Design a protein with these regions (language model features):
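Terminal or standalone catalytic/regulatory effector modules within metabolic enzymes
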Residues: 1-173
Length: 173
């Protein structure tokens, strides 16, 4: 893939070679990331380099925010969560409520760190066809300026994959 191939070529390679079915706008963001690297290096990117760039840029990026522990409880209000998270080495625990687990964690992080964003895109799928397969979740958050930040999370537990995707999107703001 070179700088002329665009987002379609990058998305096609990630889907056909690695089984990643990125949301359309995330595919576009990945295409721009690949183009930037291709332009900077003055060379075509091979499929493995594209996959490595995806993992480095969008998958399970755990800094400066990270999640240490999460607990959920079903209540009359929805899902209540207690999230222990770390930002730049400082660990805090926050409780929040949401209409689902991901929404509850998102609300806890917003409350803990006064973050401003809206959860806009969520997509998930299995990476293999077996009961022991890992899942991948994709999350897109809209920043106050209207631009999107993206994250992906990979884990055998889809809830953990979703939380990791959210944290990566926050870290990519």
């Amino acid at each position: 893939i070179n700088s002329q191939s665009g987002k379609g070529g990058v998305g096609y390679i990630l889907e056909t070679k690695y089984g990643l079915n990125l949301p359309p706008k995330m595919r576009e963001a990945m295409g721009y990331a690949a183009k930037g690297v291709s332009d900077h290096l003055h060379k075509e990117l091979h499929p493995d380099e594209i996959f490595d760039l995806f993992k480095k840029t969008f998958e399970n990026v755990g800094q400066p925010y990270s999640i240490n522990e999460v607990h959920f409880q079903q209540t009359g209000e929805g899902i209540t969560t207690k999230v222990t998270s770390t930002f730049n080495g400082k660990t805090i625990t926050t409780e929040a409520v949401g209409n689902g687990r991901l929404d509850a964690v998102s609300n806890a992080l917003k409350k803990a760190y006064e973050l401003k964003y809206s959860l806009e895109v969520y997509q998930e799928h299995a990476l293999e066809r077996s009961s022991s397969s890992k899942a991948i979740a994709y999350v897109g958050i809209k920043k106050p300026d209207g631009t999107m930040a993206w994250g992906a999370g990979v884990d055998p537990d889809i809830i953990r994959a979703s939380i990791d995707a959210l944290v990566t999107a926050i870290n990519n703001r």
